[in-house]
C-alpha cells in the first residue's frame, strides 16, 4: 500500500470479507474512497454514472453488514453496480468497463459469484429475489436475499406483481427501495431515522407479532380496526409506507442513504430478523459527491469519457444526424400537418427522439414510464379512437410488450406505429440491449407492415409511410447512432407498400439488404467488382409485405443471392427463403445464402467489432459470396474501401 495512495483503505479490500474486518469509522473512509475511485474509473471508460455515485454508502453498508456472496445481493437494472464491482474483486479491471473483453456495464452471473442474478432490463430484482428466497427455504438455508431496486423501476407492473406474491407468502426477503428522485419520499430527518431504527428492531417486531397473535382471538371487526390503526399510525409517523404494508411488506423508512450511522443499524436489525418480507426505503441523491453530476443528474446519468476537473464530456465530431434526431424531427413535420399524430415513449424520451416531438407538441406526447406493456395497449386505445400513435421503443424493450403487440394491436389490426430504436447490435451495452430479435418476433405476425431504414433519408420517408397506414400496425426499425451523411429530403414521401429498390445493377451476384448493412454491401460490391464479379445491390425496404417480384427477379437473374440483415435467425432471410421455396426456386440452380447475427448472445464491444465478428461487414459479405461460389476468397488479403 503506497503512502501516496488516494485510496489507502480501499487498497486493502479485495473482497467484502476484507471490508467486514474494518471498524465502523473506517467504513466511512472506505465509502469516500470508493466514490473517488468510481469517479476516476468512469471518467476513463464512460458509462452509467449518476446512479452509482448515489449508492456508494448503501453499497458499502450492504457488503459490510451482509455476508455476500452467501447472502444474495441482486441489483435491479445494474446501472448503479460499478461501486459494487469495485468492492467485489473487480477493481483491477474496472477501467475495462463496457469495452471488448472487459467488464460488463451490468451485473452478470458469469462474471462474478457476487452477481447472483444478471440485470439490465428493469424491475426484475424482486421476482428473482423471491425465487431465491423460496429456494433457500425449500433447501433449509438461512442466508439472506436482498434486492435493491430504484424508484423508477419499482413503478413497473412486474415489481408490484412480485411484491404482491412475496407479501402473500410472508417470505423472508429484503427489498431496498433506492429512491433517488424524491418522488415518493418526504423530508428525511432525525425523527424519521430514529423511528426507522426503532421499528426495524427486534423489540418492536416481537410486540407487533404478539399483537397479531392476540388479534387472531379477537372479534374480526376489532382485530381489523386495531391492525389498521397500527398501520396508519406508523404511516403517519414514518411519512409513508402504507401501500407497501398493504402488499404485505414490513416498511422501514425513509432513511438517509448517505448516512452510515442510520443505514448500518437498520440493515443489521433487518438482517437478524426471522420474519419478512421487509422494504427499506432509502433516499439517495443521484451523482452524490461530484458537483457537476449533482447539478445536472439527467446529463450525468450516462456519460462518455469526461474531464474530472470540469465535468466536460468528450464529444466526437458529428458528420451526420443521428437516427433518433431524424425520427423526432420527421415526426414533428408530419404532426404539423396532422393533429391526430401523438408520440409515446416508455421512459426513453431523449433516447428515442420523442423529446424533440415533445418540445413541439407537449400535449400530444406521453411518457408512460417503465411500462412497455401499458405503452403498447395505451397506443392501441388511441388508435381505436382514430388517433395516430407513434410508439417509440427500443427493440430490446419491445420484447417486454410482445403479448400486447399480438393481442391488443395485431389481432385487431389497429394502426399503431412502432418506431423501433436500437435495432441491431448496440455495442457497449452488449447482449441485454441488442435489438436482435424484432425481425423474427414481428415477422411472424399477420397484419404487420415491417420496414427497415437503410439510411437517414429513408427513415424520413418511412415515417411518412407510417402516417399513411391506417388499416393495420406498422413498424420501422433503425439503429443507434449517426446516419451516413446522405442528402436529406425536405419532406417525407410515402413509399409504395411492399416494394424495394435496386441501388446498383449487376449480373452475377445479388446482395439483398434489409436495413443499414446496405453501406457494407456497397463496399463489398466494390471489392467484388475488382475481382471480376458484377454485383447487384438491392434495398428491400420492406420485410413484410415482402417484395416478391424483386426477390424472384434477383434469384432468376443472378448466380448467387445473398440476404443481409442486422437480426437473428428467423428474420428477413427466412422470409426470402420461404418465398423462394413456395415458388419452386430452390429446386433448381439458385444458390441462396443468408447473413444473420450468429445464434448466440454476443458480448459487448464496439458495434464495428461486433459486426465484423458476426460476418456482417463488407469483408464478411465477400467471404460468404466466395463460399457460395465454392472458391477461396483469401479474405486476409481483401482490401476494402
UniProtKB/Swiss-Prot annotation:
Gene Ontology annotations of biological process type: 1-deoxy-D-xylulose 5-phosphate biosynthetic process; glyceraldehyde-3-phosphate metabolic process; terpenoid biosynthetic process; thiamine biosynthetic process
Gene3D superfamilies named in the record: 3.40.50.920, 3.40.50.970
Protein's pathway: Metabolic intermediate biosynthesis; 1-deoxy-D-xylulose 5-phosphate biosynthesis; 1-deoxy-D-xylulose 5-phosphate from D-glyceraldehyde 3-phosphate and pyruvate: step 1/1
Keyword Acetylation applies: no
GO MF annotation list: 1-deoxy-D-xylulose-5-phosphate synthase activity; magnesium ion binding; thiamine pyrophosphate binding
Binding site for Mg(2+): 151, 180
Binding site for thiamine diphosphate: 79, 120-122, 152-153, 180, 290, 372
UniProt keyword terms in alphabetical order: Isoprene biosynthesis, Magnesium, Metal-binding, Thiamine biosynthesis, Thiamine pyrophosphate, Transferase
Entry function: Catalyzes the acyloin condensation reaction between C atoms 2 and 3 of pyruvate and glyceraldehyde 3-phosphate to yield 1-deoxy-D-xylulose-5-phosphate (DXP).
Name of the protein described by the UniProt record: 1-deoxy-D-xylulose-5-phosphate synthase
Lineage summary: Bacteria, Pseudomonadati, Pseudomonadota, Alphaproteobacteria, Hyphomicrobiales
Amino acid at each position: 500500500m503506497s503512502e501516496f495512495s488516494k485510496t489507502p483503505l480501499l487498497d486493502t479490500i479485495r473482497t467484502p470479507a476484507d471490508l467486514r474486518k474494518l471498524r465502523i469509522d473506517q467504513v466511512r473512509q472506505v465509502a469516500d474512497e470508493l466514490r473517488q475511485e468510481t469517479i476516476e474509473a468512469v471518467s476513463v471508460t464512460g458509462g452509467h454514472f449518476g446512479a452509482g455515485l448515489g449508492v456508494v454508502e448503501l453499497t458499502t453498508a450492504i457488503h459490510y453488514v451482509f455476508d455476500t456472496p452467501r447472502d444474495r445481493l441482486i441489483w435491479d437494472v445494474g446501472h448503479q453496480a460499478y461501486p459494487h464491482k469495485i468492492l467485489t474483486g473487480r477493481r483491477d479491471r474496472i477501467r475495462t468497463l463496457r469495452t471488448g473483453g472487459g467488464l460488463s456495464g451490468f451485473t452478470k452471473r458469469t462474471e462474478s459469484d457476487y452477481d447472483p442474478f444478471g440485470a439490465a432490463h428493469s424491475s426484475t430484482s424482486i421476482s428473482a429475489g423471491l425465487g431465491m428466497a423460496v429456494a433457500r427455504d425449500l433447501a433449509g438455508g438461512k442466508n439472506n436475499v436482498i434486492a435493491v431496486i430504484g424508484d423508477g423501476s419499482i413503478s413497473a407492473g412486474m415489481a408490484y406483481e412480485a411484491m404482491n406474491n412475496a407479501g402473500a407468502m410472508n417470505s423472508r426477503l429484503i427489498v431496498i427501495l433506492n429512491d433517488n428522485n424524491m418522488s415518493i419520499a418526504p423530508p428525511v430527518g432525525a425523527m424519521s431515522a430514529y423511528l426507522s431504527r426503532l421499528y426495524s428492531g427486534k423489540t418492536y417486531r416481537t410486540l407487533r407479532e404478539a399483537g397479531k397473535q392476540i388479534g387472531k382471538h379477537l372479534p374480526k371487526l376489532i382485530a381489523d380496526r386495531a391492525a389498521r390503526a397500527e398501520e396508519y399510525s406508523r404511516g403517519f409517523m414514518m411519512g409513508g409506507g402504507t401501500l407497501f404494508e398493504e402488499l404485505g411488506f414490513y416498511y422501514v423508512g425513509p432513511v438517509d442513504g448517505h448516512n452510515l450511522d442510520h443505514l448500518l443499524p437498520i440493515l443489521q436489525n433487518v438482517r437478524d430478523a426471522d420474519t419478512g418480507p421487509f422494504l427499506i426505503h432509502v433516499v439517495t441523491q443521484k451523482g452524490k459527491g461530484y458537483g457537476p453530476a449533482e447539478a445536472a443528474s439527467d446529463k450525468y446519468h450516462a456519460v462518455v469519457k469526461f474531464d474530472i476537473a470540469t465535468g466536460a464530456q468528450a464529444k466526437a465530431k458529428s458528420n451526420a444526424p443521428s437516427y433518433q434526431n431524424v425520427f423526432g424531427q420527421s415526426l414533428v413535420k408530419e404532426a404539423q400537418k396532422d393533429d391526430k399524430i401523438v408520440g409515446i415513449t416508455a421512459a426513453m424520451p431523449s433516447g428515442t427522439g420523442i423529446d424533440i416531438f415533445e418540445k413541439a407538441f407537449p400535449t400530444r406526447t406521453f411518457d408512460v414510464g417503465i411500462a412497455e406493456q401499458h405503452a403498447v395497449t395505451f397506443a392501441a386505445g388511441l388508435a381505436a379512437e382514430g388517433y395516430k400513435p407513434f410508439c417509440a421503443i427500443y427493440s430490446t424493450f419491445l420484447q417486454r410488450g410482445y403479448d400486447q403487440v399480438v393481442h391488443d394491436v395485431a389481432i385487431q389490426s389497429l394502426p399503431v406505429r412502432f418506431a423501433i430504436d436500437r435495432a441491431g447490435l448496440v455495442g457497449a451495452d452488449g447482449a441485454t440491449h441488442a435489438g436482435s430479435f424484432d425481425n423474427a418476433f414481428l415477422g411472424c405476425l399477420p397484419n404487420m407492415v415491417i420496414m427497415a431504414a437503410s439510411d437517414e433519408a429513408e427513415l424520413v420517408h418511412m415515417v411518412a409511410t407510417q402516417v399513411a397506414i391506417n388499416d393495420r400496425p406498422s413498424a420501422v426499425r433503425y439503429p443507434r447512432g449517426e446516419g451516413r451523411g446522405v442528402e436529406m429530403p425536405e419532406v417525407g414521401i410515402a413509399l409504395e407498400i411492399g416494394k424495394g429498390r435496386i441501388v446498383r445493377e449487376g449480373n452475377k451476384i445479388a446482395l439483398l439488404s434489409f436495413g443499414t448493412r446496405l453501406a457494407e454491401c456497397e463496399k463489398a460490391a466494390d471489392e467484388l467488382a475488382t475481382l471480376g464479379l458484377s454485383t447487384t445491390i438491392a434495398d428491400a425496404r420492406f420485410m413484410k409485405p415482402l417484395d416478391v417480384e424483386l426477390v424472384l427477379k434477383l434469384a432468376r437473374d443472378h448466380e448467387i443471392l445473398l440476404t443481409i440483415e442486422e437480426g437473428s435467425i428467423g428474420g428477413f432471410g427466412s422470409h426470402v427463403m420461404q418465398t423462394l421455396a413456395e415458388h419452386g426456386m430452390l429446386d433448381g440452380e439458385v444458390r441462396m445464402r443468408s447473413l444473420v447475427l450468429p445464434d448466440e448472445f454476443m458480448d459487448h464491444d464496439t458495434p464495428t467489432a461486433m459486426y465484423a465478428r458476426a460476418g456482417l461487414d463488407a469483408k464478411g459479405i465477400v467471404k460468404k459470396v466466395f463460399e457460395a461460389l465454392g472458391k477461396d476468397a483469401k479474405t486476409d488479403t481483401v482490401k476494402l474501401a
